[in-house]
Amino acid sequence: MTKVDKVKEKIIETSLYLFNTNGITRTSIQDIMTATELPKGSIYRRFKNKEEIVLAAYDKSGEIMWSHFHKAMENKKTAIDKILAIFLVYQDAANNPPIAGGCPLLNSAIESTGVFPELQKAAAKGYDDTVMLMASLIKEGIEKQELKEDIDIISLASFLASSMEGAIMASRVSNDNIHHQYFIEQIKHHLYSYSK
């Protein structure tokens, strides 16, 4: 990695933390300069504007989360175990989420809707990608004869992704992981009802 790349990566990683903990609108270029200890010129040589930094930081958050999801699924044998492993990535959503500040998808969706179309589009794609991951695992479960064949795959996948985001939000806003625990408990019952 070149020196320029390292500086750009530092800007992205630092900005991701700031945006996800303080919010996009509450984070200024000056905040990024202070946190990175870089002058304005170093930032603007790499990014046209704050919006470009936001989009790069959001992309980075996706890479980080997908890495967590794949690592969680590594030694799981069944589709249900893989799905539950993904959900357990956020088991301490209130105090110790995988990325400080909570779920970048949820935070970005809330901050972007109606005001930042490019980020809203990226967040919508992030949600769709999560639904498709769930759908691929459900399909895998059907193909391996772990799950019943009459499942509406996309409907269940969307329900699972939406429920996960809701559980993360409830745990974060209440500062209590009990909501994520309830989610896991209920989702287990729901998923096992589809077992063969």
UniProtKB/Swiss-Prot annotation:
Gene3D superfamilies: Tetracycline Repressor, domain 2 (1.10.357.10)
Keywords: DNA-binding, Plasmid, Transcription, Transcription regulation
Matching Pfam families: TetR_C_13, TetR_N
Residues of the DNA-binding region: 28-47
Signal peptide, first to last residue: none
Domain HTH tetR-type, chain residue ranges per copy: 5-65
InterPro entries: Homeodomain-like_sf, HTH_TetR, Tet_transcr_reg_TetR-rel_C_sf, TetR_C
GO MF annotation: an example: DNA binding
Protein name per UniProt: Uncharacterized HTH-type transcriptional regulator pXO2-48/BXB0055/GBAA_pXO2_0055
Organism: Bacillus anthracis
